[in-house]
Amino acid sequence: MKWVLTPEEFAHVWATETEVDRPPYPLNMIAETTADTGPEPQRLRSRYARNTDPDLTAAMLLCTRPDATVITVSGQRRAAGEPEQILLFAAVVHQHAVVLIARPEAVTVTGCHARGLGERLVAEIGTAPAGSTAGMREPQRAVLGTGDGHTEGKSTAGASRGAARFRRKLRSPVEGRGFVTVTVAPDNPMSPPTRHRTWLDFTDDGRYLLVTAAELALTPVDDAEFAAQLMRMACIC
C-alpha cells in the first residue's frame, strides 16, 4: 500500500482521520496546514472526506495507537551537492508497519510487513558502505574533554590516545548524519527505555552508528547491519 500526498493533503487527512491537529514528529517540521477558508480546503474536504479510503484511514490510525512501537528519523544528506532533509516516522503494531516519509513537495504513506521495516527505513535514509575504521569505545567525559578519561584496563596514556582518536574521527567531515529514536510499545510497563542512535556518513569513508552513554561507541555498519540494528532496537523479531 502506498499513497503520495501533498503536505496540505497529508495535514488534512491526518487531522480528519486521527482527530489530532498536528502530524507527528518529525513530520511536523515540514507538513503545513492551509487556512480553513477558500477553494483549497473545500477541495480537500470533498476529496478526502473521512474514511474515503479505508486502507489509508487504517494506516493513519495505526500511527496514533498507544501500543504502537514508534521509530522517528531526522537527518540530512547531500544529494547532487545540495543538502536534503530526511524526515521519517514509522509505527509498528504486531506484524503491521506504516512509514511516513516527508519531502518538501510530498508526504508518502506506505504500509509494509514489520519484518521489512528496517530495510525500508535504511532505503529511505540512503545507502552507504560500512566505515573502514574499526569500532571505537571510549568514556564520554574523556572524548568531550570533561574528565580524566581513565578507563579500567587501560593506562592513562592509552586512554588519552584512544579518546583523542575518537575525537578526531567525530570532527571529520560528513556527507550525511541523523538521529534515530525508538520507543517500544509505550503503554507496556515492561518495555525497554527509549533508545537513541546517531548515524554518521563520513566523507571518503563510510557509515557508522554512534551510541552516546557514559561510554561513546562508534561502530561501522553497512546497510544490512544498520537495518538489523533498527530491528533489534524496535524488538521486532
Feature map (PLM): residue ranges:
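Short, surface-exposed polybasic-aromatic patches that bind anionic ligands, especially phosphate groups
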Residues: 1-237
